[in-house]
């Protein structure tokens, strides 16, 4: 009954469809979200891997060089992007339990984590669906049990699993992809199934406005080499299996883009490509950025973001404005011509002014809150490029980026770290002592933000803790 009331209210609010920005046909929206793909894992940023189709998007659209994930691992980041709200508003702070890692090494009892977003938290898909968009989810969902219940007409392979259950290749012995075993020959990769299903959807709904959430499991562990690509990377100084997975995902993206071309839909389709968090450091170094997935140093939250919007975005353009995945929700509303003024509180802002050069994009600070523990991967070859210790990728804290400054606060001991990202992108030199006034100002702002968000801070000591 509660869900029916919610949907009725949503339909009532959105029953008046607004025109698109230019008063013409409403644009289609294709949101491509990679899994654990770091900022250095695309070939427009690095020569280690080959991603020609992602590069094509960059050459035909705008690349954001200072783009951030709203969180440093999968579920919280995806929850933020789908709801448009930061972690304290939906309570998804990590994947699974918030007390990951050895209890004897955790000084505090962390805030309890929610594994799913609240049922009454509407997603961007629900709003677009209520406004006449045909909606499809393909791949990793992770934030409720089924994307159908959160605004998608079609679901291909999505559930609340965070990893590719059953592997990347058919036949799938378990998981949500098992139902496709009879439709595809043995050895078919998930990426190819998603591409094939995406093409079928596009052909069926070529005359309807659509929202396609192409949410890859790639390149999440476990790492499985792709035979058609792995050989070219052997002896190249990279993890060849990982590299082959990246290129396979890129190939799938290319198939979807080619179908948009063939159907004459390219010019009216708004495309966003991104990743849910930084790369896994023990597999793919994010240097010069520090650390990787699970850490709130730059390597854990810097992600590739490319936007293509023919006729609106200058091809091959580059934007250095700090942006976040929280901005996608209001951007999609803006592109679709849906008034966001009476929507729920959104913690991002529309990227349309940056994309088109029209209108104002307000300066703002970026915030992260993670009152949880996330265990480490073990020893890092270059400790100065990793998290503070090998036991945890992160310990409870909050972070704010304010212009060139980035302040970390850790709740265990109140430690503060201030970095100048213009001079020290690797976050090696803590400037708290040399810049006390800046530290005090930014710290006060961070505390005020937490207060405004009702962000919980762990304070209770863990009786199992054993100082070392």
Annotate each predicted stretch with a short phrase.
Residues 2, 7, 18-417, 423-451, ...:
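Formylglycine-dependent sulfatase
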Residues 11-12:
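Repetitive helical segments and hydrophobic/amphipathic motifs
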């Amino acid at each position: 009954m509660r869900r029916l009331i919610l949907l009725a209210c949503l339909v009532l609010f959105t029953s008046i469809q607004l025109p698109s920005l230019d008063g013409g046909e409403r644009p289609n929206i294709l949101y491509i979200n990679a899994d654990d793909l770091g900022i250095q894992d695309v070939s427009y940023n690095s020569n280690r891997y080959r991603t020609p189709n992602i590069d094509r998007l960059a050459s035909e659209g705008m690349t954001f060089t200072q783009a951030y994930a709203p969180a440093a691992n999968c579920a919280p980041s995806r929850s933020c992007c789908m709801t448009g709200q930061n972690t304290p508003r939906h309570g998804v702070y990590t994947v699974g339990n918030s007390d990951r890692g050895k209890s004897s090494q955790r000084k505090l009892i962390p805030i309890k984590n929610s594994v799913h977003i609240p049922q009454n938290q509407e997603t961007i898909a629900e709003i677009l669906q209520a406004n006449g968009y045909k909606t499809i989810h393909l791949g990793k969902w992770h934030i409720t049990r089924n994307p159908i219940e959160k605004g998608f007409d079609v679901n291909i392979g999505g559930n609340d699993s965070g990893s590719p259950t059953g592997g990347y290749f058919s036949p799938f012995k378990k998981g949500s992809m098992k139902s496709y075993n009879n439709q595809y020959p043995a050895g078919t990769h998930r990426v190819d199934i998603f591409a094939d299903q995406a093409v079928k959807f596009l052909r069926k709904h070529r005359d309807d406005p659509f929202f396609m959430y192409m949410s890859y499991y790639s390149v999440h562990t476990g790492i499985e080499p792709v035979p058609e690509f792995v050989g070219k990377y052997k002896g190249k100084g990279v993890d060849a299996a990982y590299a082959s997975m990246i290129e396979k995902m890129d190939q799938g993206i290319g198939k979807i883009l080619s179908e948009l071309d063939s159907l004459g839909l390219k010019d009216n389709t708004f495309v966003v490509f991104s990743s849910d968090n930084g790369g896994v450091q023990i597999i793919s170094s994010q240097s010069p950025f520090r650390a990787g997935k699970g850490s709130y140093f730059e390597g854990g939250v810097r992600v590739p973001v490319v936007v293509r919007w023919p006729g609106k975005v200058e091809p091959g353009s580059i934007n250095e404005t700090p942006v976040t995945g929280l901005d996608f929700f209001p951007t999609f509303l803006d592109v679709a011509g849906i008034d966001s003024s009476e929507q729920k509180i959104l913690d991002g802002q529309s990227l349309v002014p940056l994309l088109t050069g029209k209108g104002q994009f307000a300066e703002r600070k970026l915030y992260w809150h993670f009152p949880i523990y996330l265990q480490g991967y073990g020893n890092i070859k270059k400790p100065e490029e990793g998290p503070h210790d090998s036991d945890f990728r992160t310990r409870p804290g909050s972070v704010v980026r304010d212009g060139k400054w980035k302040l970390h606060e850790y709740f265990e001991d109140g430690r503060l770290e201030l970095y100048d990202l213009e001079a020290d992108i690797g976050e090696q030199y803590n400037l708290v002592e040399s810049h006390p006034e800046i530290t005090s100002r930014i710290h006060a702002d961070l505390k005020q933000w937490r207060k405004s968000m009702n962000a919980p801070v762990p304070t209770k000591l863990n009786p199992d803790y054993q100082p070392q």
